Amino acid sequence: MKTFFSLILACATLSAPVQSLGSRWFHATAFTAQDFQSPSLEYAPFTRWWWPGNDVTTEELKREVALFAQQHIGGAEIQPMSLVMPCKGKGRADRIMSFDTPDYYQHLSAVMDAAQQNGLIVDLTDGSGWPAGGTHISEQENNQTLEVGVADLKPSHYIPVDIPHAQRGDRPSAKLVAVLVAKMTGTEGTTLLLDKSSVRDITASVKDGKVAVPVKSNDYKLIAFWQVADMERPMLMASRDAGFAMNHFDSTVVAKNYDHFLGSRTGLGKYMGHPLRALFNDSYEFRADRHFSDDFIKTFRQNRGYDPMPYLPANIWYGYNNMYDRMAHPGQQPSFAFDANDWRLRYDYDLTISDLLRRHFLNGSRHWLESRGMLHRTQTYGLNMDIMGAAGDASIPEMETMIFAKASEGGMKMISSGAHLYNRPIVSCETAVYFGRAFLTTPQKLKMTVDKVLSSGVNQIVWHGTPYSYFPDGYPKEGWYPFFNNALDVNFSTFFSEKNPFWPEFRDINIYAQRAQYLMRCGKPQADVLIYYPFLKFSEDAYNPRELLISGYLPNVEPEPAKDDSRPFNSDTESNWLKQIWTLIDELNRKGITWDWVNDESLQSATAANEGNINIRGNQYKGLILFHLPYMQLNTAKALDKLAQQGTRMITIGDLPQQQPSYHEWQQADKETRQAITTLAALPSVTADPHALDSLHLPLQSMTDLDCIKQTRRVLADGSILQMYWNESKKWRQQTIQVNDNKFRFFYWLNAEDGSMTPAKPDVVHCLEHAFAPLASAFLLCSPQPADNLMDTAEKGKKQRKKETVAFNPAQATLVMDMPQWDLQVDSLPTGKSSADASAGKSLSLDHQSLKDWRADSLLRYNGQPCTYTLLTKIKRNRSKHYFLDLGQVYYMASLTINGQNVGKRVYAPYVFDVTPYLRKGHNMIVITVKPSMYNELVKRGIDGNRLFKRLKDTGIAAEGLAGPVRLYEQ
């Protein structure tokens, strides 16, 4: 999530391969009914645990570790930081800024011991703050940037002239990379137009910082390129001296950094592998104007096939790499331009940077850590790069719920697809982090977020996040939460704290996610088809308009987000392509076809398999989709031509590529690409038939026209399949699923909420029916054998189970009565400036009230306390029927009692209760207690002048209360 947070602050050894000890973390998970009902804590969500630097105590750390285990949090990623403002109190600043001291490592050791006792796993962020670095990193070991200096040349001037220094970031340590002479043909805005044929590389002629350059006219420029440290320092590092960010493009520096933070002086060696699992590195948004490295030129020549030196001008574009510069100066244009093929030069440069990052940082990190029993967990994006290939280079590739700004399914699947293609068994997600959404996370929103990321391929949630319990002067009664700060205008979710009123309900979400993640770790992922992704970037303005939680926003429930001011660099080619492809993805969802993206590197290593399938690193897919492609790498086109000749199934939609993206001999390469594609398109295994998707033989096929049902599939060792379904709509949906594989004889619907397994029986045409509640998920197990540990349970409690498994289905239910009028009571309603302290409020009682969203109620609009709704009503009961009470729309937790008996609680949709055992003939007393969020109360504090929340006062308010309609159904 550092992308957006960094924007806010900007505006205010590669060792030889060794046997991996880290692989112990990747044990196979075999499904059993018993383990599903009560999975190990390792399958529970993790949380990012923020420390106020080293201002912590051993006693409190141990208490919080035990609390995490009780809360069904399976692990913690420790992230010490200095974001404590205001920072009052004697000695507080010194304690905060004492990261990386013996006392700090004593605190870490205490946590490791407590984690072992409580069965928790521990990850560490790479140092403190981000990006990784510190005083052990020198300026020479900082990330490097390519900078430029320009001078005018005079005709017939034989006197040596000084080489121009870098216009930006010049340092004594700067190293000359290249000196070019080029003729300028004009300008276009701020861009200097250059004649490519005039470019001369005169680097070899430079002597003592000077060069003699005779030219024929005044139009010539002397252009010098310099390798310069970008001077980036770790942000929010809990140390007086942050030093420098490490050079991610030099494996020796990467190893030096790990030696420092994990070396013998830290005492952490004995914990590596138990409970210390991984080191975490955030996404790769750095301050370099154009990334560079000592071995860039050599690597470029080897990997791209030509000398980049004469073409370096096309790669000077401020804001292209450096997002901070893009924020400060939006709309910048390239400094130089040659012609319409400059995009190819940038593509080749980007791909080389991708190669270098993967070689030095990703592979270097993985080898260093895995050889010591640890893993490298990292967010493999932030640059124009082979994102899927990079995901394959991480031990645990990670995404976030702000990935590529909008957090669309397509963006998330860039990471999960890479993990699947390269056989990375765990895919993590920094979850419930949303920009501008602090204090708006409710159990319902959290459940939706969990289902969205799991259905996008995640199987390890890392909450963002939990602050150390800390109450410095100047903070509200809820304590320190680093990602909401009024003075700095910092605003990110989520406040996973004991002081959050939903803390008890968060435990329910954790238990649900624990079971669901257990299922999503069983076996291996299986996608039916692959969609070729030709780009090195995922556009930040692209998202499926049908998706929920775009930018973390719930329309009509939450205040509208502020205007998006992220100012991303987006290519129209990428953005337009992504905006077109959502219709295809919607169609795949309708048909129940699971899918992944695929990159060039994977297709170039693919082999043909039986029955038209394609094999990539042992994973088989039923086909490849080529969708409206603007270009394709030449080697990919040749590889696909060969695969198609061997019978690999391919479906083409729209235009096929007529060019490739590299500048290397581009005319000939384009011609060869066209030839390969033309040959491929004529082969019998390749079709442009719009109905070709219907001919795919799927193990499970959706027969109902519903594009709102998302799915993901796992294949178990015995051939069984586990398929997750998520109803993304706010309506009940009836889904018909056809089973096309005769080996499956036993079917079960698995409910991760309560751990139940309900046998299902296909009809005569091998179809299963299931009613999906609004925003609900379900998991289908199809197996050739009965589920382990289930049959005995089924036989022993057959009658009882029949009663328990009657599920509400609105299509089969009859409305008995509406319940529109209720008596309301709030025990302590905050009023006036005392709203900062709920205990200062007064009680409120209202009789015969219509149900409504509290935004429309002047008395309850800013209430943050539970509200009780009471109704005494007469009910005619038929003993042969089941009765269900549907509360309608609830904001956000509802507990129910009937006639003094506790029925239960619901923390997310559907807010439906089976009330059959609790109703009696005649009058019934129904009591509903609704717990709202804390958001509107905090808005009121801002309105009342509380400076800590003044930025919330004009944001609007969120839906709260019981809006209904409340209805009783008979079934």
Residue ranges, per PLM feature:
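Short acidic/polar inter-strand loop motif in beta-rich domains
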Residues: 230, 786-788, 931-939
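Short hydrophobic beta-strand segments in globular cytosolic domains
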Residues: 903-904
